[in-house]
């Protein structure tokens, strides 16, 4: 249990963020991970996390002009914003040690699938990102102390919300990055 839970919101003016008290919340969860080397060349890994985080005492009262308090919002039982219920990573690596006199010393292929969701963006739980995942890969070509890497992030160009906020009675969503491709050159001294 968390007492004096605090969350961040945009100020009513829309200028800047403020931290507000959100009463109490309860969070529990579990996680597991596994890594296996199937051969000298091939290794696999997986991890999973589950979190259940809800408000247990979060009521917003409003005072009328006569000084009477009325319940403006009751968030008890609602999921705490920005906490993914599930996280998942599945990946693998295949490393080839090349023969002497080859151009490369080693060639390594890596791929992983990262996923998260459902993520609620508001205390009302009226805006959320469903469970989603991105596929990423990398191919490394190693020569002595040098390495050339070809890589892709969000290879399948999954459309998802990376962030959401509300200000001045409007909602704004930041989309996740689209598919990205690149080349890295590294040299160790």
Whereabouts are the PLM-identified features?
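A short beta-strand motif that forms part of the nucleic acid-binding face
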Residues: 1, 11, 50, 152-156
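Gram-negative outer-membrane beta-barrel transporters
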Residues: 20-122, 186
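Outer-membrane beta-barrel translocator domains and adjoining extracellular loop/strand segments
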Residues: 5-14, 51, 56-63, 119-126, ...
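Conserved C-terminal beta-signal and adjacent last beta-strands/turns
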Residues: 78-189
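Membrane-topology and secretion signals of cell-surface/extracellular proteins
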Residues: 3-21, 26, 33
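Generic structural "secondary-structure junction" signal
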Residues: 9-12, 22-24, 44, 82, ...
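Residue-level signal for pocket-adjacent positions within structured domains
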Residues: 2, 15-17, 75, 155-156, ...
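Residue-level detector of intrinsically disordered/flexible regions characterized by low predicted structural confidence
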Residues: 5-8, 23, 63, 138, ...
């Amino acid at each position: 249990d968390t007492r004096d839970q605090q969350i961040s919101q945009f100020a009513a003016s829309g200028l800047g963020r403020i931290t507000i008290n959100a009463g109490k919340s309860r969070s529990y969860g579990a996680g597991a991970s596994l890594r296996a080397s199937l051969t000298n060349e091939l290794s696999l890994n997986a991890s999973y996390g589950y979190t259940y985080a809800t408000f247990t005492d979060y009521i917003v009262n409003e005072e009328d002009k006569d000084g009477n308090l009325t319940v403006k919002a009751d968030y008890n039982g609602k999921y705490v914003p920005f906490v993914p219920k599930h996280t998942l990573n599945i990946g693998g690596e295949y490393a080839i040690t090349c023969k002497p006199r080859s151009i490369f010393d080693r060639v390594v292929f890596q791929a992983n699938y990262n996923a998260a969701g459902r993520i609620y963006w508001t205390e009302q739980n009226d805006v959320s990102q469903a469970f989603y995942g991105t596929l990423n890969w990398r191919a490394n070509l190693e020569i002595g102390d040098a390495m050339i890497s070809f890589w892709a992030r969000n290879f399948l160009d999954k459309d998802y919300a990376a962030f959401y906020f509300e200000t001045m009675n409007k909602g704004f969503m930041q989309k996740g990055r689209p598919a990205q491709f690149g080349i890295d050159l590294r040299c160790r001294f």
